[in-house]
Amino acid sequence: MSVSLTPEQQRRIEENRKKALARRAERQAQIADPGPAQNKHTQSGTTGGPAKNNQHFASDRGQSGAPTRQTQLIDINAACTKTAPPTSITAASTASSFYGQAGKPSTGEKRPPKPPEPAANIPAKKPAVYLRGRCVSHSENRFRVEVGYHADLILVFKSIPSKNYDPATKMWNFSLEDYQMLMEQVAHLPSISLKPLEGMEGLNISASTCRPKDAAAMAALMRLCQGWQKPGATIKGKCVLVSRSRLEVDIGYQADVIGIFKQMPSKSYDMKTRKWTFLLEDYGKLMADLNELPTVETEPLPHAVLQSFSSQFEKTQSQAPVPPEADLSHIDPQLTRSLMPFQRDGVNFAVSREGRLLLADDMGLGKTVQAICIAAYYRSEWPLLVVAPSSVRFTWAEAFRRWLPSVKPDSINVVVKGKDSLRSGLINIISYDLLNKMDKQPPSSPFNVIIMDESHFLKNMKTARCRAALPLLKTAKRVILLSGTPAMSRPAELYTQIQAVRPALFPRFHDFGTRYCDAKQLPWGWDYSSSSNLTELKLLLEESLMLRRLKSEVLSQLPAKQRKVVTVTTDGINSRTKAALNAAARELAKGYHNKSQEKEALLVFFNHTAEAKIRAIMEYISDMLECGREKFLVFAHHKLVLDSITKELGEKSISFIRIDGSTPSAERQLLCERFQASQQSCVAVLSITAANMGLTLHSAALVVFAELFWNPGVLIQAEDRVHRIGQTSNVDIHYLVAKGTADDYLWPMIQAKMNVLEQVGLSESNISENAESASFHSRDRQQLTITEMFQRSFDEDEMLALMDQDP
């Protein structure tokens, strides 16, 4: 049965939008005639164009500007949205289908009385007003907005200089020059989402660095990307970005095409490549002329390039603008004073990108300290989440303690078990694996600032770790990705990181894959494993989200050797090992009157430390391999540790060499030559005392000390297996130090001895430069006593004699 609306009902609906959305209208919707005046208003989620009556109300109230009605609607909307979850308005969310009144509740309209209903009387079922609309082309230089009525939206419309209301269509239209202004203002209305104008979907309204000065010109460029395919074309080509200022047209010979090229003011022909290049400011005219040729098909530059280099299409500049100096006065001086110039530049870049970037500096350039400084810049938005490989969780905690002394140590929360809280600290540090396990226990509110260490762990969007991380990253306001090995040769592995930082850049993976992964359609599906247009991709990433400096570029600012203390944990060791380690520590604490017994007890403690560290050592080596470190050295002392490392590498089919006390002298040189010549992943597993001299392994630039040794001279000799004549890179030295083990006492002693050597000129570098990042050495009397035992029990000759005997 169907009943038409009475004239009285129509009049009342036109007078007041809230009456049209009254509950009485909802109840009548089941039997009402399915006309636009009812169905499109009463049924939330109905697809189609905007309701005519809503547009009519917009015209009446927009033109009359009756304050009482507008005030009533705004007050009710505010009351409704108080309990509503925040709505993120992004290109991804607005790319969904257009709904005239989708999700629009009819709250607050139980009856038609004139005063507004108090918030307490608003039904709880539909607490948020949510309105979807779209921008569509209206004429050559204008666009219109198809959307239902919302009082706040009408106020925005009225503020646009080129506003025009069309009574015939009951819609508002605007000049393309004001498109940017309108979308920016609508982005601040949490209950409204407008689908972008066709061709402008990729435009990131919120990113100040990517705003075009002339939205109309940008819209025209975007339209060049539409409908460029010509089925009957006999000549096909494409435009490719070759520098920040120039594009290349890769196309076969055709007289008309060459004629167009020669007319371009910035034309340049390369005799070697036989390609034409042009300034970006000529792109619009170039494409417009080429599109006029019926037999020529030219693939345009992708939306992402137009968006990221928008200012270049207006007036081309060869040099990128230098980011302004960020104000770091509110950050701990201990941190800001320690930044090298290029690291300060990295912080400036991050701030200019509003805290969303991929920091892809080479290993050893201080990505950690830069990330901490960037996060500290946005400290008012904390709590902070740090996601890192399991082996470096505690290294991050120590780094925060060192660089941000204003942060209380007990406010740093390192998640070690799945049952631990993810939000109990101001700084929360978790591993990728644990984040995946806690995926089903999301935090009560999203993290606004997130650091993802070794973000290339997210390279496969199908993995559990990626599925757990991406939702957090999409809701975060600041996203700091760290990776020393961006997969530029495998662009498909970069896509998830691009999505995390700038999701609007490439909303669809297939578009990214066809442009940069040389996508091919095979019988079983699409293959995205290759690469294409890599120069353009590199330029695009550097312009929009990525900062990458190589060691060779900042060599003058770096020390020849950079030492890093990596704090590892003994969590996960079996109860027997743990009990033995604790027992050895207790025995040492008692003290000995007999020097021989003291030495023996110290060696027992050292041996149990090796057993307790094995798991953490293997985890760290695995992380280094996954991070892309193809060649490095691992020094250890105990046979148990050396055996465990080589066994693990063998099981993973990783090439390695091993040199220890049992390796014949004749074989050592052959093993070194094999390592030096290797072009694939290869790890040199070496004994600290048996392979610390006489070997040249400078094809690697990373040394990992899985165990400590209390003679710093031996450690320096081991470091110099790679830091020697022929080394063309800076050398990274990583010391793995475990709390609650003999390392607590060995490391302070090593520092003290090295300081003495430096003061007398016997060492050119201080091994304790980075030691502050590992504050293991407490000042309780028991620990000092054990340290003194290590110092007095062995002179250098005795140490070497005892330690050369592997247990």
Curated annotation (Swiss-Prot):
One family name in Pfam for this protein: SNF2-rel_dom
Domain of life: Eukaryota
Keywords: Coiled coil, Hydrolase, Nucleus, Repeat
Annotated Basic and acidic residues bias: 9-27
Residues annotated as domain HARP: 127-198, 231-302
GO molecular function, one term: hydrolase activity
EC number: 3.6.4.-
CDD domains, alphabetized: DEXHc_HARP_SMARCAL1, SF2_C_SNF
Extent of motif DESH box: 453-456
GO BP, sorted A to Z: angiogenesis; cartilage development; developmental growth; DNA repair; embryonic body morphogenesis; hemopoiesis; mitotic cell cycle; regulation of transcription by RNA polymerase II
Gene Ontology CC entries for this record: nuclear replication fork; nucleus
Residue ranges annotated for the Helicase C-terminal domain, each copy included: 620-773
Annotated coiled-coil segments of the chain: 8-33
Enzyme class, broadest EC rank: hydrolase
Composition-biased stretches (Polar residues): 52-68
Residues the entry annotates as binding ATP: D361, D362, M363, G364, L365, G366, K367, T368
Motif Nuclear localization signal per record, residues: 548-565
Region feature Disordered, mapped onto this chain: 1-68, 98-124
Protein family according to the UniProt entry: Belongs to the SNF2/RAD54 helicase family. SMARCAL1 subfamily.
Listed name of the protein: SWI/SNF-related matrix-associated actin-dependent regulator of chromatin subfamily A-like protein 1
